Each structure stands twice: as C-alpha cells, then as structure tokens.
Amino acid sequence: MRRIIIKNTKNIKQLTFDIPNDNGVYLLVGANGAGKTTLLTCLDRICNPYAFATNFTSANNTNNIDQYSASSIEYITEHAHIKFRKGTRRWACTPRTNSSPLLKREFGFENTIFIKADSKRIDVPQEEIRSGNLVDVESTIIESLNKIFETTKYNNLKRLRNVNGRGRNSTYFYILKDGRKYYSEKRFSTGELAIIRLVERLQTTMSNSLFLLDEAEMALHPRIQKNLLDYLNEKATEKD
C-alpha cells in the first residue's frame, strides 16, 4: 500500500489516493478546480522536499489568514506514516527526523519530475534570447518529436547555448533552422514547445522515476494527443 490522504488543501476537502502498484501511464481526469494539480504536487513531494514550499504558497490578503492552517497531507505505507501540516512559516512533518529519505524509500521512487502547466514551462523572455553557440539536438529527441507530430521539420532543430547575463549556468533554447533563418522558441506554439520540453526531460530521466505532467492535452489535436500517449507508454516500458 502506498497511500496519500489530503485534507483541506486548495479545493480538496478530503481525498484518499492509492498509488497503483504497476508501473505505466495513468491519467487523472476531473473537472477544472477538482484538485488534480494539488494531488500532483503531493505526489511530487515524495522525492522533492521543496514541492510544498514552491506550490502551496499563501495568497496575500489583508486579514493575514493562512489558507493552509487546517491542511494536512499524510503519506501511508505498511511500514511508515508521515504527516505534514502547515506551521507558521513552513510545512512541518511528523516524524521530524529523516522524514524525507523515509518517504522516498517507502514509496520506492528514485526521483520525481513535475512539469507544470505554467508560463515557466513554455515562455522565455525575449531579452533572454541572445546570440550564442548553436549545438545539435540529440537524435533521439528529434526522432521522438517527428513521430509525435507526424513531420520531419524537427530534423533541423538546434539548441542555442546561452550564458546568462551574470555569467552563471548556461541555458539552452531551442532554435528551428529553416534555410538561413532561425526561429526562436518564441515562435513555437504552446503545445509544440511544451512537448519539446517534455521529451527533453524524459530522455534524461532515470529509471523508476515518477514523472508528473499537468494538463497533458496542452491544446493539442486529438491525433497528436494519441501519439503523445503512445510515446509516454513506450518510455514507461523502457524506464521500468
């Protein structure tokens, strides 16, 4: 048994969710506001100690009311019971000692990757697209994108290696070459860019990871959605 119990968190009054024992691709279906993203955040917390701090932030209001003051999130297995509650400044858990490694070990995942449906996933400020060194994209990524979108245009997909303004870590942006012209990802559609990011992350994801994708349909044509689902099933089998 690998169970999560969520109470009084976002739009969820109470939810008991059992993680399937079999590896594979699973779809969460529900109306807008049903709490799907909240559940995905709780799943992300299995391996990501910053999941709650990043995604469960209190909205600013004049009454200084913490919307998570009555929240609780429990993780239960046959050998462990870990409970999180929102304290004054941060989420606290019981037991306090070694809770993160215990949670990861008991639920049996090496890592969690959460790709959220937000602007950070699909938007890059125009000022961040500067000159840099163009490098080839891995052939496995190109092949996967061509197959999903039923095209060959990604044969000329490139990365732009870009050192940020403060000289720190390099960032990669996708550039599509068309003759002598290069198109930055600012010209890509939302669904197109989201799948590029998705495929890139899946290529480097270690086996036995929990990969979480919010709003998987991403305004895609139903035929492309089917191709994407087939691709995800292939990767789930490959990284079992």
Regions found by a protein language model. Give the residues of each.
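Generic detector of short, locally flexible boundary/turn motifs and exposed helical patches
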Residues: 37-44, 81, 135-138, 162, ...
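Phosphate-binding glycine-rich loops and adjacent basic patches that engage nucleotide phosphates
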Residues: 1-4, 99-111, 152-163, 189-199, ...
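P-loop NTPase switch/coupling surface
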Residues: 1-137, 144
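Short, charged low-complexity intrinsically disordered segments located at boundaries
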Residues: 71-76, 173-181, 228-232
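Hydrophobic, Leu/Ile/Phe/Ala-enriched alpha-helical segments that form helix-helix packing faces
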Residues: 43, 47, 141-153, 202, ...
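Switch/communication elements of ASCE P-loop NTPase nucleotide-binding domains
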Residues: 2-34, 44, 184-240
